[in-house]
Amino acid sequence: MTEHDTVLLAEDDENDVLLFQTAFKKVGVPKLLVCVPDGEDAIEYLKGAGIYSNRMEYPLPCLLITDLKMVKRTGFDLLEWVQTQTQFNGLPAIVLSSSLEESDKRRASELGAQAYWVKPAHFEDLVELVCLLKEKWLTPPQPADLSSIQNRLP
């Protein structure tokens, strides 16, 4: 796996992790989903520290998805840390939380999150969210079809 093949999910609810893994498979996301239980483990993963030191086994992600309310370090802590690390300037971060609080949405945005989505109550709605993730952040842009232009060149 390369860094372009990996998505990092920081989520402490095992049921939500299982649902997310199932939705990834159902949608056919061509990426490895690596799940960590909290913001602290996500930071260790991104640093390549401790059990995550082998980059062949734990490659850098192309996308970070985080819950907000986690036991050790929160999603806010994680976003704040990522924001201070210049090597992660281009890493898109998505918040997927059960919080409906406008202040949480605003703070996540201030800390660099590209999107804030409320965790859906139904699996099919999660599948739709994963489809959006795939389209917007996990599918490389297709090269333009220039065949009609090339046919007109002298």
Model-derived segments and spans:
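Conserved acidic segment of CheY-like receiver
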Residues: 5-15, 20-25, 33, 64-65
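Alpha4 helix (beta4-alpha4-beta5 surface) of REC/receiver domains from two-component response regulators
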Residues: 18, 22, 77, 100-115, ...
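Acidic catalytic/metal-coordinating carboxylates
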Residues: 38, 59, 74-77
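Short amphipathic alpha-helix used as the core "switch/output" element in two-component signaling
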Residues: 51, 76-89
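Active-site beta3 strand of CheY-like receiver
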Residues: 53-65
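Active-site residues of response regulator receiver
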Residues: 67-68, 97
